């Protein structure tokens, strides 16, 4: 039986990405000495849920197309508070918080890796099941 989801971030600067997850996001971790020596960290990322979005859809008369891909998003209870807290720890964000139908979102820069979406959901939460 499936017990959890393990996500991977491929980084051009793995030590910087790991430091961001450890020091800025404050995620607890285990060290995997078999994964490549000291500093190979696996993080506890909290509760999770998974949604499946179509690559083509029409909503409110607008057409949306997206290539097949996977996306990592971090959820929070209060996006304004979370953004301010993370900025205080050195996190950088692109643009302003945007209202979407499913929640409030902003893209967060991750050192050495692609951005991660931070959002305050406005949809039912599956991780509480």
Predicted regions and their residues:
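Short glycine-/small-residue motifs
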Residues: 115-118
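Conserved beta-strand-loop-alpha-helix junction that forms the acyl-donor binding cleft
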Residues: 11-13
């Amino acid at each position: 039986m499936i017990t959890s989801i393990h996500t991977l971030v491929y980084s051009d600067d793995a030590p910087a990405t790991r430091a961001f997850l450890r020091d800025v996001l404050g995620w607890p971790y285990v060290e995997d000495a078999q994964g490549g020596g000291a500093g190979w960290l696996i993080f506890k990322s909290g509760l999770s849920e998974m949604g499946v979005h179509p690559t083509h859809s029409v909503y409110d008369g607008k057409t949306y197309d997206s290539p097949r891909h996977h996306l990592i998003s971090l959820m929070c209870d209060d996006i304004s508070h979370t953004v301010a807290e993370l900025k205080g720890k050195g996190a950088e964000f692109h643009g302003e918080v945007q209202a979407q139908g499913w929640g409030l979102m902003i893209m967060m820069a991750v050192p050495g890796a692609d951005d991660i979406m931070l959002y305050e959901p406005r949809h039912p939460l599956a991780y509480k099941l």
